[in-house]
């Protein structure tokens, strides 16, 4: 595997590029799935050792490069923000809005569906340049979706980026998906600057949002700007570090004008500047020393401390403005240059498969052997488009790279930099760059090298699907139907397809109703396939609450070659686990290794379809510690069958339970509908966790069984006159109510009898 130091591999669902049984571990001793999280100080020590290995050319190229993602809660203004970035960096000549009247739409929303719905569905990459202090800096920029149903797009972007801009709404503050994005940034150790957007909106309060960032996200954050004016009177911002007022002028805010701090803001500027220094003193030793000596740090010392603390992921500087009002965006571009890391300041490591998976540090030098990660696939006009982050070495047009997983050597016939759905051909890209290429048959998460190295990379965390529905093409010609499903599965690891042998139906699974609805619509538009879908179904899980011993013999001997396999051991519950585990403790070789491997396969298959209702099994440990073989009749099939039967027997004796997905629900609505919304949540068996009352609207956060949430969007619209909005995110699995469990088991048994 390959991982950024500190990444904890996700085990909640199959990982892109891995087998479908990746959540099951097989070893002769208990398997530990967690990895040690390194501190930034440990990373820094390794980076200091790598630095002398870089040439001046490598260092210079790296210093001028930033790989940045734009992330936020839905409707916080990410895509509008990115549109301004493209305009001010000269990448586009005119600004178009997400829901523009000209029917053009924002550049980064290239799909028709995105422009129609006004949301980002796929992450989009672009490349632009920004000039600061007479130097030109190059940004690889990825705009990500804000809706939880498309969370894999955020995961795969943050997996390969070095820094991020977290966009927060000045009115709504930290919202449910903001918390999710924060968790994703921590998972991949991505430092961030924060931009408080929509400062021109009524009710905007940046300092309340900063307080929420500190309290809810638990990361020290402080303003480095204060607004000039408020709401519709927003005129600009004051840079409190330099004590300079900055105004956006021109038809699109393209001209920056500086001036003295307005008289009525001087006290606020000094107050927030003192708070900034105090916050930095808590996270940076050099500022702490100056602070304790009761001296005032210089401007350069403050900026250096912000950079150190931001890259160390101990602090986030907060800027503010309004993307829609063309205010404050250029300041964020300056902050990206000043405070976010370049590729040589981020430690990435890999495992050398040729040396028993020894950990190796990747060197961000273009003179080193090539190592890259395919992190995203798209079907383009010219075939499969594969996005690759280059960690080490170079990629050249006409050159060859090797897929470490398959061993297949492929030629790079075309190399491009992406600009949303447009592309620009390039001859080569170096370490730290992000590019795309055509004609490579691979999966998302595959590692590529120049063929001299056998380094392997881990893929991104892939959450488990929580909702399924049956899907059938209206036409008997299923060629395009199969093509679409195969393509979508390959592109999106959270989109799963299976054939149900009992109902004889194709079943698709994903992260939510919108997620699956989008794919059904894309089939119609892109493949001309009209589909009929069934009622959404919850992805339940089966588990146990106690343990049981087993001693099972599978015997089939009726003359000639037969089958014989005996397995003994126990089945037990793994507390708070999203995995299943198989282990052996055989003494004296009573069961040969080849039969134990068959036992592991039997366990994997048994976990795919539980005994209660045929859903996947979760949180179970199976130990085989004894058994017996027959000199003639024992074989792999016999031991696989014996293991599956032993599993079923012990499972039903271990207090089996059906688990249902519990969702984290966040509902925001005008205050006058609060009673209606609370009543609606109570009907859904929701447990309300928190209620926040704002000036005009309120937000309720609750935990609710997914089973009760179908049709919630319609109910919420009816209860709030169409003014309420909500977001759903999977929280955890919990035992379903006894009544629901009985009903599910009865329905399953009835289906089995009808077969």
From Swiss-Prot:
**Gene Ontology CC annotation, any one:** mitochondrion
User: Which residue ranges does the record assign to the tr-type G domain?
Assistant: 63-344
The biological process GO terms on file are:
mitochondrial translational elongation
Q: In which pathway does it act?
A: Protein biosynthesis; polypeptide chain elongation
Matches recorded under SMART domains? EFG_C, EFG_IV
Q: Which domain of life is it from?
A: Eukaryota
Q: Where in the cell is it found?
A: Mitochondrion
| Transit peptide interval | 1-38
Q: Which residues bind GTP?
A: 72-79, 143-147, 197-200
Primary location: mitochondrion
Note whether Transit peptide occurs among the keywords: yes
Q: Name one GO molecular function term.
A: translation elongation factor activity
Family matches, as InterPro entries:
EFG_II, EFG_III, EFG_III/V, EFG_IV, EFG_V, EFG_V-like, EFTu-like_2, G_TR_CS
Q: Which UniProt keywords apply?
A: Elongation factor, GTP-binding, Mitochondrion, Nucleotide-binding, Protein biosynthesis, Transit peptide
Please give the function described in this protein's UniProt entry.
Answer: Mitochondrial GTPase that catalyzes the GTP-dependent ribosomal translocation step during translation elongation. During this step, the ribosome changes from the pre-translocational (PRE) to the post-translocational (POST) state as the newly formed A-site-bound peptidyl-tRNA and P-site-bound deacylated tRNA move to the P and E sites, respectively. Catalyzes the coordinated movement of the two tRNA molecules, the mRNA and conformational changes in the ribosome.
- Give the family per the record: Belongs to the TRAFAC class translation factor GTPase superfamily. Classic translation factor GTPase family. EF-G/EF-2 subfamily.
Would you tell me the protein name for this molecule? Elongation factor G, mitochondrial
* Organism of origin: Kluyveromyces lactis (strain ATCC 8585 / CBS 2359 / DSM 70799 / NBRC 1267 / NRRL Y-1140 / WM37)
Upper lineage: Eukaryota, Fungi, Dikarya, Ascomycota, Saccharomycotina
